[in-house]
Amino acid sequence: MSDYIVVKCGGSMLDQLNDLFFDCIKKLQQKYKVVIVHGGGPEIDAQLKDCNINAEKRDGLRVTPKEVMDVVQMVLCGSTNKKLVMNLQKHNLRAVGCSGCDGNLLQVQPVSEEIGYVGEVRYVETALLKGLINMNYIPVIAPVGINDNEIYNINADTAAAGIAAALSAKELIFITDVDGVLHEGKLVKKTDEFEIVNFIENGVITGGMIPKVQAALASLKMGVQKVSIVNGTKDFTEVTGECIGTTVTRGVSIA
């Protein structure tokens, strides 16, 4: 069991996770070393609304001035992270929650001054993750990072991709509420980056699936071997550890 798997669970999925999801994590853990990265967008938006703070996005990134960063940190590192950790432990999965600023885990480069405290992963302190895994814990990572002793918000997809690339992970799994990419009503089980681009250009992939496959393509460019898009409300893992969904690679052949 030497290969790493990174599982990215979006904030909109956290309240939909059922027993099947946790059973799938158990199956993955029998074959691989598992790391989970989570989002928290809906809860952040709700908290910002309660605080009468404007929520704004540019090019898919949350504009994060200081007052927004305080809320992002409170939600991601606090309630959202701990809720997922407790849920894993309730299903007899040993988990430790931490954020990207703990132990300098995720060191970031600021994206631009115009969008505030938003960073891109430039370095991952993998020794911390490996240490937790070697003690049979699943690291559960809140996507915030650190630069010059300041905390930055990180897009959860790119945080997961950065961690997967740093660990030379065998696979990055995006947990969604759909079965994967559909073509003429049928699930596309295996594809590559060139076919995905063609699907987007020809309108096969539309709506909410576009950002998911774009995140998959970005992950491949960062060095991840393969990316799977799966339905987290269903059994998405074979007993072999293979995913049931759409698997995207840089080439048509899947190792």
UniProtKB/Swiss-Prot annotation:
Main location: cytoplasm
SUPFAM superfamilies recorded: Carbamate kinase-like (SSF53633)
InterPro entries: AceGlu_kinase-like_sf, AcgluKinase_fam, ArgB, Asp/Glu/Uridylate_kinase
Pathway annotation: Amino-acid biosynthesis; L-arginine biosynthesis; N(2)-acetyl-L-ornithine from L-glutamate: step 2/4
Keyword Cell division: no
Protein's GO biological process: arginine biosynthetic process via ornithine; L-arginine biosynthetic process
Marked site (Transition state stabilizer) residue numbers: K8, K212
Catalytic reactions of this protein: N-acetyl-L-glutamate + ATP = N-acetyl-L-glutamyl 5-phosphate + ADP
GO cellular component, one term: cytoplasm
UniProt keyword annotations, A-Z: Amino-acid biosynthesis, Arginine biosynthesis, ATP-binding, Cytoplasm, Kinase, Nucleotide-binding, Transferase
Localization annotation: Cytoplasm
Binding site for substrate: G40, G41, R62, N153
Its EC number(s): 2.7.2.8
Gene Ontology molecular function terms on file: acetylglutamate kinase activity; ATP binding
Pfam families: AA_kinase
Primary role: Catalyzes the ATP-dependent phosphorylation of N-acetyl-L-glutamate.
Similarity remark: Belongs to the acetylglutamate kinase family. ArgB subfamily.
Protein name: Acetylglutamate kinase
Gene expressing this chain: argB
